[in-house]
């Protein structure tokens, strides 16, 4: 292989896959999202139901991930399971997550654990959710109890998944619970609460576990057309909140970068995905099943933004991926994204991981099970796992620390039952 064909990643670099509890575990009946999915008039195309049954199949899935050669697994512990009613903590659920963590260690896979990944306990939402004045203290107490029960098995802890995108999703766009639109006052309260929740939640985790702690942010690569300045579109509001989290991350052990595409903003506002699934699913060479522009190069720009904005806090790429029915396109996307990582490393940026989203084809929130992000398929009836060629390709990268061209893609696949 020539130098143009191979990038060499550093010793100890983590390459793995990411997931979120509500999207793969199944039966998350005490969560706000479970209620949201079953509410009359819900925007969700289908309910999460049993999801991928990861709750009962985690050993199989972690063994599968390790068998590919991947060395890191990001997953979330579900607040709605650990504290299903206010002040009532489930030791059985903490024990369950200890088993998940132990399985990671058994297979020499580093667990990267998120304490809050989008879904809330239903009772928290009933109290006012992210906009409630009580939210930071409730999250702090939960983090203290969860880290107290799990801390000795953690390798990395992420406080909140994409807190920079949650306020607009729930209070401006209405695509997440509680489903309000245009409520800027509630959005601002949620923003302040999430900033404080990260501070106090992170401190609670550190008090219980000697592990690196950070926040993971939603970072599309925003590009303005010539002559166009910042506006107040939801994605720009998110970006301004990202900047505030970057300031907090100066004191953190790492910051997580989660990037899928770029968003170009012109005089008519952001040029992005159509909200209608029937149009989104018409995937083209230039777009994905989410309606996103196919632009893996976005990752290099957002890594550098995070590095610059935090003053040099180490970077974990905690999500990068593509929804596609064409696995060769997935491999090409991952290769291009990894080239951006290699370029950032060459420029002196301290990037420590690349985690692909997602390990499994999973529940993609309001779009249900239609977008296919996974390295592994999951039969909706039998739950049989069907590894894709992309899983083997990424595993080979993890084993060798070399990023070959997609001409070297192994197209073999097998069904695991």
Locate each region found by the language model.
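Non-catalytic scaffold segments within catalytic domains of secreted glycoside hydrolases
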Residues: 1-62, 66-71, 80-417
């Amino acid at each position: 292989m020539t130098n143009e064909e191979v990038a060499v990643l550093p010793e100890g670099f983590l390459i793995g896959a990411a997931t979120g509890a509500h999207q793969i575990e199944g039966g998350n009946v005490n969560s706000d999202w479970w209620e949201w999915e079953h509410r009359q008039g819900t925007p969700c195309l289908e309910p999460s139901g049993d999801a991928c049954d990861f709750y009962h199949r985690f050993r199989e899935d972690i063994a599968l991930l390790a068998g590919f050669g991947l060395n890191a697994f990001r997953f979330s512990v579900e607040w709605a399971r650990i504290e299903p009613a206010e002040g009532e903590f489930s030791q059985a659920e903490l024990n369950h997550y200890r088993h998940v963590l132990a399985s990671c260690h058994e297979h020499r896979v580093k667990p990267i654990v998120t304490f809050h990944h989008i879904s809330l306990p239903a009772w928290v939402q009933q109290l006012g959710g992210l906009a409630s004045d009580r939210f930071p203290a409730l999250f702090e107490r939960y983090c203290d109890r969860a880290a107290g029960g799990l801390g000795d098995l953690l390798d990395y802890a992420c406080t909140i998944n994409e807190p920079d995108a949650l306020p607009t999703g729930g209070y401006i766009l209405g695509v997440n619970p509680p489903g309000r639109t245009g409520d800027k006052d509630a959005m601002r309260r949620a923003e302040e609460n999430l900033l404080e929740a990260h501070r106090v939640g992170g401190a609670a985790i550190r008090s219980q576990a000697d592990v690196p702690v950070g926040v993971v942010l939603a970072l599309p690569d925003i590009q303005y057309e010539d002559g166009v300045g910042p506006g107040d579109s939801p994605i720009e509001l998110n970006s301004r909140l990202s900047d505030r989290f970057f300031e907090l991350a100066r004191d953190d052990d790492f910051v997580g970068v989660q990037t899928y595409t770029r968003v170009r903003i012109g005089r008519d506002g952001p040029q992005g995905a159509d909200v209608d699934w029937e149009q989104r699913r018409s995937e083209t060479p230039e777009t994905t099943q989410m309606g996103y522009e196919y632009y893996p190069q976005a990752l290099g720009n957002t890594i550098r933004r995070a590095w610059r904005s935090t003053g040099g806090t180490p970077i974990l790429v905690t999500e990068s991926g593509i929804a596609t029915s064409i696995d060769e396109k997935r491999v090409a996307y991952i290769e291009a994204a990894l080239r951006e990582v290699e370029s950032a490393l060459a420029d002196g940026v301290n990037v420590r991981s690349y985690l692909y989203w997602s390990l499994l084809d999973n529940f993609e929130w309001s779009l249900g099970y239609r977008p296919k992000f996974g390295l592994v398929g999951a039969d909706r009836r039998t739950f049989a796992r069907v590894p894709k060629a992309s899983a083997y390709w990424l595993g080979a990268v993890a084993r060798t620390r070399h990023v070959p061209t997609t001409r070297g893609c192994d197209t073999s696949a097998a069904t695991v039952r």
